[in-house]
């Protein structure tokens, strides 16, 4: 199987988000990369499901709370930007201050 670089990046996000969710289920607080992976994964999948950019920008702020992550992580993540594939093409989705 030959994957293009973009497909490899998406696959890496899926694996990282899966690992993060498993750690979260064990009661662990998420670190910076785990938090970004979960948010990114949910945005990509939301786009695939047909949600709008505006809807995803709002949805991205509801995925994780300060209680879900290690101390200092919310202050480290100012924006999460992801290129997602929508039914009408690829668009950039930006979520500002995603962990509240």
Swiss-Prot record:
It catalyses: urea + 2 H2O + H(+) = hydrogencarbonate + 2 NH4(+). It is found in: Cytoplasm. HAMAP family: Urease_gamma. Heterotrimer of UreA (gamma), UreB (beta) and UreC (alpha) subunits. Three heterotrimers associate to form the active enzyme. InterPro entries: Urease_gamma, Urease_gamma/gamma-beta_su, Urease_gamma_sf, Urease_subunit. It comes from Arthrobacter sp. (strain FB24). Its EC number is 3.5.1.5. It comes from the Bacteria. This is Urease subunit gamma. One of its GO terms (molecular function) is urease activity. Keywords: Cytoplasm, Hydrolase. GO terms for biological process: urea catabolic process. Pathway: Nitrogen metabolism; urea degradation; CO(2) and NH(3) from urea (urease route): step 1/1.
